[in-house]
A protein has these predicted regions:
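Short amphipathic alpha-helix used as the core "switch/output" element in two-component signaling
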Residues: 64-78
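Acidic, metal-coordinating helix/loop segments flanking the phosphotransfer/catalytic sites
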Residues: 20, 33-52
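Active-site residues of response regulator receiver
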Residues: 56-57, 84
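Conserved acidic carboxylate
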Residues: 10
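C-terminal output helix
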Residues: 90, 108-118
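Two-component/phosphorelay signaling modules centered on CheY-like receiver
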Residues: 13-32, 37
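Alpha4 helix (beta4-alpha4-beta5 surface) of REC/receiver domains from two-component response regulators
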Residues: 87-105
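A short, hydrophobic beta-strand element within the central beta-sheet of small alpha/beta folds
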Residues: 77-87
Length: 123
């Protein structure tokens, strides 16, 4: 059986590495992380879309995580889980418009991450 693939879109390198380690140890195939929405979209044009995207809401660059998630969902119908360090009601309302599979608050706890990923992939 092939491991399900996950793309991490996170502009903080240490957080991306932490997520990669947790997910790889749980048996998921983690694609090389990208640090911006633009990178994520370019990456997805070149490869088979992953089974899941973990996306930081606040990314550097011209596309924030919410707009990037909107484009990913429209093009590829891939489930997205948002990562956030903030609970700003305006940002959360915007994020809800793209129907994410969940939100994980930073700092990310292993149990919380794996529960959200499992739910997004298997209902």
């Amino acid at each position: 059986m092939n491991a399900q693939s996950i793309l991490i879109v996170e502009d903080e390198g240490l957080i991306a590495l932490h997520l990669m380690e947790i997910l790889a140890n749980a048996g998921y195939r983690v694609l090389d992380p990208v640090a911006s929405g633009e990178e994520a979209l370019r990456h997805l044009e070149k490869v088979t879309p992953p089974d899941l995207v973990l996306m930081d809401i606040t990314l550097d660059g011209s596309l924030d995580g919410i707009e990037t998630a909107r484009q990913i969902r429209n093009r590829y119908m891939v489930p997205v889980i948002f990562l956030t360090a903030h609970s700003n009601s305006h940002i959360m309302a915007r994020a809800q418009e793209v129907s994410p599979c969940g939100y994980i608050v930073k700092p990310v706890m292993e149990k919380d991450l794996l529960e959200h990923v499992e739910k997004a992939l298997h209902g």
